[in-house]
């Protein structure tokens, strides 16, 4: 039996021909294997390769997808509440999605859904970020390989996907909370370590792992940095963080610093109290604390 082979220029697969004529025709026309030909004919409805880039927005979306998306072997599926449709549309634009964003109704609730397929890219993403199909119970082993700048964007994506930014009771300052299955505890500890003492991790009474980020100056600085990276933060969450707001502790520290400055310049305590807008006992207290 006649048998001659050649290599597919696209994937490197060996192609076998049963006649010399067939081999000559294929060689002359530089034909490729059926699988590669099928992929070329298929219309691309998205470009997931952008999610392999080392950019702030890519890492933001990967954090978001790790929290709120689903990865199977071939595709990425994202479903959000209908009121967050604009955010899903931003993701669709980022991956050049040309398919349909579906509206899903379940009783009184409506959600929007997007499914983007690319077997090769999804495989690479799952390997790069250690993502399993049942990621709710099997999180990545570690995220500490991500550079700091991109790590912050990744955290922001997680917050927008599975976190909350909430006000303290009867206060204008906020705290951030991320709640996950208890198997996520090591990952939340990695995230919390970036924020030092203001990032606390615990297992709550229901058995979930929770990360709390407190300390308004740290949260305010986080938002400032993220705005520099021009990533698509959710306004309904990050809008709660007022960059001009100062806590009572910050205001107190500034007042004490101003009093100390005037004391060292030799200004009388009565005049300092009037200038700064405090009582003389406060000036005396600062003098005892800082002036030796």
Residue ranges and their predicted role:
Residues 2-292:
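Internal intein/HINT superfamily modules and their associated LAGLIDADG
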